């Protein structure tokens, strides 16, 4: 009897044990109004003339089969240029469960609703997405952050406004009770999903160059910087590692080559975080619908060896900006909480539609594809070294550029200098050096 009891206890412990893995999804942009089978003006898609799906040689045989068999699957799982429909959302969640039905936690870096939706479909889409994710992972700590399409209208984030009230009502199951007041006031909260780890969810829309609101404390909108430093102090005192998550990362947009944050807010952010270089392990963001990395060097004059801040930018679920749906699974060290590997999963929308089922595939294993020494984790220094290797290796850069769009087509305004340039001046300096070295 004692042996049986021990076996049962071991089984229970093993079921509840951490697996040192978490999922990261971003930019779902689910639209309850999306019917991509129609593909007309009513679905608000980007015009098909800019798509390049026929350029893929591996599509040719499937195209012939589709035409010969007259398969009614075109647009079934969405289209390049269109936001996420109901079937694509369901298939993404199904594949997430297939990859890991019991992750330690899930990071969601914002933008749940489709683009350009009126208020009614916008709120309906937000609610449906939250219910779908919670229904699939009812016992998993899900950690969201606010995207520019999570507020109405777009980028309209203020202190203590109706958007925050709506999002709290939609995300109440994920916001810790002791963080409700912070979320309702500024849209940020902190949570510790596993022992030794603090995750800080920032409302980065407050800092966006596209946020036209004025604030009573313009140097610190909604007091979020002061709040951030309080959380970093508490985490450091507790001996916890910190992940910072947000929607819009501080740095340069790869398409417009412009700052994503207003410059004074980016400076303030790095001034604060540079004092906690050994506490902050990584940052996770989204927004640009591309799988990218950033490694920005901290600048603390009191230190002789400033570290690099590693940022992992999530590619998107929606194929609206001509990419394949992608999500990632991160593996982390149980003690240091350093990231030790990343596995990305994608599905080719065009092939999925032609075959009539989603063709999910492991896109890459970060450590293997980039030959990373992860003995001490994948931190800012490792990402900076990878950037330096990209400069001298076309094959490494080409892999990175291909993965940016979920293995669709490279649209490369991408350049290696973007990885560790936080400002236009830094980008220009890096580009000048690279050109002269070459």
Curated annotation (Swiss-Prot):
Belongs to the acid sphingomyelinase family. Glycans are attached at residues 40, 160, 271, 338, 359. Binds 2 Zn(2+) per subunit. The gene is sgmD. This is Sphingomyelinase phosphodiesterase D. Residues 1-17 form the signal peptide. The keyword Nucleus does not apply. Keywords: Glycoprotein, Glycosidase, Hydrolase, Metal-binding, Secreted, Signal, Zinc. It comes from the Eukaryota. Its EC number is 3.1.4.-. InterPro entries: ASM_C, ASMase/PPN1_MPP, Calcineurin-like_PHP_ApaH, Metallo-depent_PP-like. The keyword Secreted applies. Its cofactor is Zn(2+). It is an enzyme of class 3 (hydrolase). Zn(2+) 2 binds at residues 111, 148, 247, 287. Zn(2+) 1 binds at residues 27, 29, 111, 289. GO terms for molecular function: hydrolase activity, acting on glycosyl bonds; metal ion binding; phosphoric diester hydrolase activity; sphingomyelin phosphodiesterase activity. It is found in: Secreted. Its main location: secreted. GO terms for cellular component: extracellular space; membrane. It holds the Pfam family ASMase_C. CDD domains: MPP_ASMase (cd00842). GO terms for biological process: ceramide biosynthetic process; sphingomyelin catabolic process.
């Amino acid at each position: 009897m004692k042996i049986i009891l021990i076996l049962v206890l071991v089984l229970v412990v093993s079921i509840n044990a951490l697996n040192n893995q978490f999922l990261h999804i971003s930019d779902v942009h689910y639209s309850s109004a999306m019917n991509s089978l129609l593909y007309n003006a009513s679905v608000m898609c980007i015009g098909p003339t800019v798509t390049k799906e026929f350029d893929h040689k591996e599509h040719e045989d499937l195209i012939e089969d589709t035409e010969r068999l007259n398969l009614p699957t075109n647009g079934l799982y969405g289209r390049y240029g269109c936001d996420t429909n109901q079937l694509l959302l369901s298939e993404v969640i199904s594949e997430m469960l297939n990859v890991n039905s019991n992750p330690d936690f899930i990071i969601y870096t914002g933008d749940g609703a489709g683009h350009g939706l009126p208020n009614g479909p916008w709120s309906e889409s937000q609610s449906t997405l939250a219910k779908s994710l919670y229904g699939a992972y009812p016992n998993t700590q899900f950690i969201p952050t606010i995207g520019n399409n999570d507020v109405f209208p777009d980028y309209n984030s203020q202190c203590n406004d109706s958007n925050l009230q709506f999002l709290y009502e939609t995300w109440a199951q994920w916001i810790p009770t002791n963080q409700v007041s912070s979320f309702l006031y500024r849209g940020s909260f902190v949570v510790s999903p596993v022992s030794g780890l603090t995750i800080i969810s920032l409302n980065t829309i407050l800092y966006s160059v596209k946020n036209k609101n004025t604030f009573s404390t313009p140097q610190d909108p909604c007091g979020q910087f002061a709040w951030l430093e309080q959380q970093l102090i508490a985490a450091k005192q507790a001996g916890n590692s910190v992940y910072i998550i947000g929607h819009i990362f501080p740095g340069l947009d790869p398409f417009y080559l412009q700052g994503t944050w207003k410059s004074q807010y980016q400076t303030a952010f790095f001034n604060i975080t540079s004092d906690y270089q050994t506490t902050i392990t990584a940052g996770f963001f989204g927004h640009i619908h591309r799988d990218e990395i950033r490694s920005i060097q901290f600048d603390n004059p009191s230190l002789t060896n400033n570290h690099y801040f590693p940022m992992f930018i999530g590619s998107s679920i929606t194929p609206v900006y001509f990419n394949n749906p992608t999500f990632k699974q991160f593996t982390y060290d149980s003690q240091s909480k350093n990231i030790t590997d990343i596995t990305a999963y994608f599905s080719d929308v065009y092939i999925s539609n032609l075959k009539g089922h989603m063709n999910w595939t492991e896109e890459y294993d970060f450590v293997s594809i980039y030959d990373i020494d992860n003995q001490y984790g994948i931190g800012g220094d490792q990402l900076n070294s990878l950037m330096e290797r990209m400069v001298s290796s076309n094959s490494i850069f080409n892999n990175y550029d291909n993965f940016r769009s979920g293995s669709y087509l490279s649209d490369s305004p991408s350049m290696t200098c973007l990885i560790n340039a936080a400002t236009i001046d830094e980008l220009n300096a890096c580009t000048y050096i690279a050109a002269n070295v070459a």
